[in-house]
Amino acid sequence: MVVTILNQLLLGHFDRRRFISNLLYIVPFSYLVQFIGYFWDWLQIPALSLLPRLILNVLGLLGVAAAVSIYQRCNLIQHPNDDLSYILRFRFLHGSAIIAQWTSYLQPLTIIVVSFFATGHLRAIGFGTVFALIAQGAIMGWSDHHVFPNLKHHVD
């Protein structure tokens, strides 16, 4: 909800369609993520050795970055965090997918750092998190030009 409000502030005006679509995305997405977790457990992915899990992790992250590139270009309905990177990219960062993605990660990174200093522990920070933080923007930018290249961004 906080990111949805931040998106509206960055737009400089209230965009009802965008606000509602951000909220509508969250609920089914949460259930999908939970279902995928159960599905991976059913396939016994967590029981695999490190190398196959790393390969699956990287392939999954490549797929997610390409998918975000596609649906950002469609710009129909977006997860609030993806919409944030989209707004930052085209309103403030001259179209740079890399810088926009890094900038959109400042909020969760701040929460991670504050939590670490408060507890002395890092939780749920693994290879996939670090890989996404470093490379997702670059993969999205590459996907913009190589995955359905005729699909263009509709900046509003």
Which residues make up each language-model segment?
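Extended, low-hydrophobicity, polar/charged segments
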Residues: 1-156
